[in-house]
Design a protein with these regions (language model features):
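N-terminal Rossmann-like NAD(P)+-binding domain of SDR-like oxidoreductases, especially those catalyzing
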Residues: 1-145
Length: 145
């Protein structure tokens, strides 16, 4: 495998922030591995367009790898962590939407709690030095003004 500045895992890579971050990191000669479950909460075609946006930046087939996987899938996550010696993990994946969380709480628990717990465990097991976690503005609740 080619020498890169860093080997970086980005979860939620088909989201707005994930795709722009991936494109920037690829342009800086990093190996970026992107994960996303491509669920239908947001437009699937929009997510696919974002992946094409990332692909347009990669200069060689080795600079970006995409895996369609849910973070609660321990086996697939373990394979991915085994295949790459990540320097950095950036967790942007989450099930969005406060109203949806009330209608389908199990989806939230699987994605946002079990999935993130798996990321934490694999970061510990694979001795990842840097984990970056971004959350949603929804955690702040309603504005009082």
């Amino acid at each position: 495998m080619k020498n890169y500045k860093c080997r970086i895992l980005i979860t939620g890579v088909a989201g707005f922030i994930g795709c722009h971050l991936a494109k920037k990191l690829i342009s800086e000669e990093n190996l970026v591995v992107g994960l996303d479950n491509i669920n239908d909460y947001y437009s699937i075609s929009l997510k696919k367009d974002r992946l094409k946006f990332i692909e347009a930046e990669k200069k060689k087939s080795e600079t970006f790898r995409f895996y369609k996987v849910s973070l609660e899938d321990n086996e697939k996550l373990r394979q991915i962590f085994n295949n790459y010696n990540f320097d950095i993990v950036i967790n942007l994946a989450a099930q969005a939407g406060v109203r949806y969380s009330l209608q389908n709480p199990s989806s939230y628990i699987k994605s946002n709690i079990v999935g993130f717990s798996n990321i934490l465990e694999f970061c510990k097991d694979f001795n990842i030095k840097h984990l970056i976690y971004a959350s949603s503005s929804s955690v702040y609740g309603l504005n009082s003004t």
